[in-house]
Amino acid sequence: MAVLPMKKIEICAMKRDRKAILEKLQSLGMVEIQTDNEETDDFRKMSTTSQRAKYEKRVQNTDEALQIIDKYAPEEKSIFASLEGRQEASEADIQEIIAGRWDYNREVKKIQEISKDIAGCEAGIIKCQVAIDGLAPWLNMDIPINTTGTEKTDVMIGTMPPGLTETDIQGYISSAEPEIAGYTVTVVGSDKDQTCMVAIAIKTVSQRVEEILRSHGFTRISYFSKRTPEQKTDKYRADIREFEQWIEDKKNELVSMADDRDKLRLLADYYRIRADKYKVLGSILQSKSTFVISGYVLERDVDRVVAVLNEKFSLMADVYDVPEDEAAPIQLQNPKMFASAEGVLESFGLPGKGEMDPTTPMAIFYISLFGLMLSDAAYGLIIFLACFILIRKFPRMENGLQKSLRLFMYCGISTLIWGILFGGFFGDLITVVSRTFFHHEVTFKPVWFAPLDDPMKLLLFSLLFGLIHLFGGLALKGYMCLKKGDAKSFICDVLSWFMLITGLVLMLMPTELFASIAQMQFNFPGWLKNTSYGLAIVGAAIIVLMSGRDHKNPVLRLALGLYDIYNLTGWLSDLLSYSRLLALGLATGVIAQVINQMGSMAGDGIFGAIVFVIVFIVGHLFNLAINMLGAYVHTCRLQYVEFFGKFYEGGGNPFRPFRENTKYVDIVSGTETQK
């Protein structure tokens, strides 16, 4: 439950060492380098755009080559591959890649060229297939496509509107020129768009025949070839077979290159590291002979960073407290159990300047409320075992994913405990199975009470847990006020609300309204009733008189105080939000019981048992998934809106040290490489 203390560091060294020092800082991964430094007359930024662009282009090319290999030679992966983590690379592996990077660059280029050639062949196949489809209506024509005629005849090859026959076309000609002779018309094929035809006429009448045909939609074919349509189609099919064979050969060549997949991944990450280095190099201030690096380092890492730099370089490292007017980046540190909830906090926002880290109390409430919403012992056991097994089996999974699984593992334990308290084990599975198949009813009795038998009791305790949650947020606000030494804010903004809300709750408890809801009657002694009145009145008076204490105008102060009292409606709204604990808790149990009843409808025979098992598996998997999602969403909502709304704003920037950011591999040790 802590924000790790941060220090500011400034490093000044000779310009000739700038690349080596940056590489050492990158391998250490402990210093966040500021990139928004202002230039002066003596210290200016050096443009590294061309060098950075060069390495980014190499990253892009190598990533593209890997995608090509994955496309044509997919890697066999298990369904849990995403949990296995990235492969590790040692310093020796990096040095091997550096030594052979030019050979690998040529391989990358070759892979890209092969991919382009394959794409060209695939386009050629499409082109040939389109041509074959276009020639299909002409296959019955037994003369070359480019035939224009003989010494005494003209040949007109073309198309007319669809649906015409030879009789129709000859009718067009005879009706226009009844006396004309010396021609013939043959329809060789047709489709939905055209009628394919050949007209042969002696030269003396061919021009007139064509004019008549054109008046009825005739168009000469624009395709020319010395082959017949059938011969041309055979040629295209041969070309397709040749393209396909060539593609197959090139694919096999790519498959043979897949053995270098891991090397190319390491190469891409090496170039990615180099690109990051030049990006930072272009942001630091440099003079003619020196350069300056400004940044942040965790207080615990200061001695190591300074010692490593002084051991290898001649430089000056100045470490000092972060100035008051600067917001230092945030790095959280919590016990492993509570650190699992840091992702929930980060989704809302890291602590701002002067704020505490609320991870630990938030994690306690998160885990407890999640279990209360799901509240089935069997579901909790399944969640716990699934997450526990995955964490143990895949210890190298990504840190963020491991934290999430660890959080759900603890939520599973909470769900198991609440399920035992409420008597839920796959709903009423034990009762239904014993009654249906063994004809003797056995029940899984709740340790506390069954929510379905007493929903108002669950509602009452849901609101009680909500009040504890809200008071927890208000208490943390008070803690931050006292930590800053602001006793006035503690009394006026925290203690006053504790007094008012506590007084109002104590005033409500002996009433008939509360008794009708809670199904229990409270009879307070007179002194306790008077105490509740006093708490409410004093708390309200402090709020009214002190909420606007920053303003000197008494009327404005009073108006602001009265407006702040109106925030009681906000407290009521927040408190009623916890009725979702009742709704989700009941929903899980009701749906589970319905599933069990549906499964038992087929009776107690073999067929009934088979039906029950199928309905049980499908139904409870669905119920677990949908209610687990609901519990996750609504638990997050209660943290973000109700809990954080009482004390926490967030807005801090995460600590992002300059390190070897990679995509494919985890580098187990730093490397020192010179360009």
Where are these regions (language model features)?
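Long, charged N-terminal accessory/stalk domains
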Residues: 1-362, 390, 401-405
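Conserved, carboxylate-rich catalytic/transport cores that coordinate ions
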Residues: 2-7, 16-22, 26-33, 303-675
